[in-house]
């Protein structure tokens, strides 16, 4: 009774007719299997058209489909495996392993469409998540259960920063990570997989990919697949989970394609009219509960660098912190190339972080801002034209700039310097001492690529020798 037949195929959208009593619900999975043609396709019901026909979105290529083919109503949404068995593996949007390994068998599967945690289950407290990365912890700290936007062009170090976060959460907090590759390059996913294996972090993370070559249905849903796997670790294993989404813009882009295929009237700039709803349904599930938390780091591509474009603008509304990577900083050889003045965080306040942290962070930003304003004068007239106070600001700013860099564990194989995890107390103490002028006598080079302030002092001795 629950078998229907395909009546129309329009690219990635397929119409299926069922008997009136067997009509599948919205978001139900419908399977089309034709072994002799090697077709094994899953569709997701998106609309009821009337006349016992449903309109579905395909999760993989519709090549080879024909009208009249049988389609099975599974009676449930797309469900994916969850649990410890998913760690160290790569999945597609349907939860099938795509890393040429053996099939993943888990005791539990979750549907990818799930309600966000109820208000009473959410944890109202705001707690900082220590990353061990100085520039982030000091100036744009992450909150547990928060959402962080990661902005940066090609080749400024987004992936390395993501890898270091995964490494630090695994090593220092014993936490797990889920990486969702949404509509990005397959080559980048492959590189990430190989680098994760080399750095030994792969056993602490699950990876889900729906890349550029996949139909829009897969790219629209793969974020939910990754989020569902992360929810299991939060709700059942009481973990603090890191969820990486690369790239949240492609999620919106896929939604726009699906919306057009479904015949919906476009909204501003041609985006789907349901843009805010779709984004909200994904983002509201990313939160802290009384059991654990999901902290999400989302790479955000900004089309034509226009921050008012509806896609990035809708994502901004959900963010708690932004980490902006700047090419000018990476060109100076300062890594991570996080812009200390452009990056910000909602939790950078004395009520949450304490007076000392807040004051040191603001003092550091003030010195860097003054240095930025003086750079034109320095470029035209040179350092000699500055007053003594201004010269002092410049010398401290240059030390701070270098001290904001640090060697990463995951980049050890390239740099040859062992990675450093810096606790927040050490970070605050180090910058406080530089701001107060305790280390004005040390050479600038001593502050570059070190962890704590003690290491800078040791490096200065070595340079002096």
Swiss-Prot record:
Organism superkingdom: Bacteria
Pfam families assigned: ATP-synt_ab (PF00006), ATP-synt_ab_N (PF02874), ATP-synt_VA_C (PF22919)
Any single Gene Ontology cellular-component annotation: plasma membrane
GO molecular function ontology, one term from the record: proton-transporting ATP synthase activity, rotational mechanism
Subcellular location: Cell membrane
Membrane topology listed for this record: Peripheral membrane protein
Binding site for ATP: 152-159
Residue runs in coiled coils: none
Keyword terms, alphabetized: ATP synthesis, ATP-binding, Cell membrane, CF(1), Hydrogen ion transport, Ion transport, Membrane, Nucleotide-binding, Translocase, Transport
Catalytic function, reaction form: ATP + H2O + 4 H(+)(in) = ADP + phosphate + 5 H(+)(out)
PANTHER family for this protein: ATP SYNTHASE, ATP SYNTHASE SUBUNIT BETA, MITOCHONDRIAL
Oligomeric and partner information: F-type ATPases have 2 components, CF(1) - the catalytic core - and CF(0) - the membrane proton channel. CF(1) has five subunits: alpha(3), beta(3), gamma(1), delta(1), epsilon(1). CF(0) has three main subunits: a(1), b(2) and c(9-12). The alpha and beta chains form an alternating ring which encloses part of the gamma chain. CF(1) is attached to CF(0) by a central stalk formed by the gamma and epsilon chains, while a peripheral stalk is formed by the delta and b chains.
Main function: Produces ATP from ADP in the presence of a proton gradient across the membrane. The catalytic sites are hosted primarily by the beta subunits.
Name assigned to this protein: ATP synthase subunit beta
Organism, as annotated: Desulfitobacterium hafniense (strain DSM 10664 / DCB-2)
Encoding gene (name): atpD
């Amino acid at each position: 009774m629950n078998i229907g037949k395909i009546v129309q195929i329009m690219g990635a959208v397929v119409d299926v007719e069922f008997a009136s009593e067997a009509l599948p619900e919205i978001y139900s999975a419908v399977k089309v299997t034709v072994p002799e043609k090697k077709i094994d396709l899953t569709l997701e019901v998106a609309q009821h058209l009337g006349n016992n026909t449903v309109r579905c979105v395909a999760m993989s290529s519709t090549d080879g489909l024909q009208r009249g083919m049988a389609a099975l109503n599974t009676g449930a949404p797309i469900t994916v495996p969850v649990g410890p068995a998913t760690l160290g593996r790569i999945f597609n949007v349907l939860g099938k392993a795509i890393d040429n390994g053996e099939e993943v068998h888990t005791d539990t599967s979750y549907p990818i469409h799930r309600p966000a945690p109820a208000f009473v289950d959410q944890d109202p407290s705001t707690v900082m998540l220590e990353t061990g990365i100085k520039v982030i912890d000091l100036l744009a700290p992450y909150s547990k259960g928060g959402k962080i936007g990661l902005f940066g062009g090609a080749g400024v170090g987004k992936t390395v920063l993501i890898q270091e976060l995964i490494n630090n959460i695994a090593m220092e907090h014993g936490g797990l990570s889920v990486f969702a590759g949404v509509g990005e390059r397959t080559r980048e996913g492959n590189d990430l997989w190989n680098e994760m294996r080399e750095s030994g972090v792969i056993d602490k993370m699950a990876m889900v990919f729906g890349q550029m070559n996949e139909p829009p249905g897969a790219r629209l849903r793969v974020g939910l697949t990754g989020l569902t796997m992360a929810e299991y670790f939060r709700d059942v294993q009481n973990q603090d989970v890191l969820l990486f989404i690369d790239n949240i813009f492609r999620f919106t882009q896929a939604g726009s394609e699906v919306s057009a295929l479904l015949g919906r009237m476009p909204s501003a700039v041609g985006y789907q009219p349901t843009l805010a709803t779709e984004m909200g349904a994904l983002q509201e599930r990313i939160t802290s509960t009384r059991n654990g938390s999901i902290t999400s780091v989302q790479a955000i591509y900004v089309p034509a660098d226009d921050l008012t474009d509806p896609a990035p603008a809708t994502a901004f509304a959900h963010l708690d912190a932004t980490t902006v990577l700047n090419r000018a900083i990476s060109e100076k050889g300062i890594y991570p190339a996080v812009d200390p003045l452009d990056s910000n965080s909602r939790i950078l306040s004395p009520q949450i972080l304490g007076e000392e942290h807040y004051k040191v962070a603001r003092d550091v930003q003030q010195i860097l801002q003054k240095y930025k304003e003086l750079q034109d004068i320095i470029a035209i007239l040179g350092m000699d034209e500055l007053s003594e106070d201004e010269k002092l600001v410049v010398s401290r700013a240059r030390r701070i700039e270098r001290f904001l860099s640090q060697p990463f564990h995951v980049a050890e194989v390239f740099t040859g310097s062992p990675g450093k995890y810096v606790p927040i107390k050490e970070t605050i103490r180090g910058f406080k001492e530089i701001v107060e002028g305790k280390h004005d006598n040390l050479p600038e080079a001593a502050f570059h690529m070190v962890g704590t302030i003690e290491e800078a002092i040791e490096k200065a001795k070595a340079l002096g020798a």
